[in-house]
């Protein structure tokens, strides 16, 4: 699953339940989310972030200038990725909070983790820790929008790309 998560392939070797058995396991969820995010944000963004981070560490530039020195593409990719993860997490969390077939049986922290995992993986890799068929209709629609947007240019995810959507709203 780690290779599939990093490549955003969505290949699931666990059968028809995907990662549902690990819905409340923070180590598996966080590790998988990090792999998905890092590969979906794009390798050009990685290079830009690492190059500017190196300059901050070596004190070539002040730390407060770090984000402002990123290329426009990198800024849009980072901001849109964060915005989509947060908005998806909040939407799924509240829409599915009382649904006994998805988040309803979990404690609030587990619900937040599962909602965040769903938000991250829907845009790119396609894994699931909650039943996709049991989602409320509004959650399915929001997930379809996230799928349509996908990841960032230069990454391994599909979709119309985060920067394209950002440019539509600017």
Tell where the protein language model's regions lie, with residue ranges:
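Membrane-proximal intracellular helices of multi-pass ion channels
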Residues: 1-170
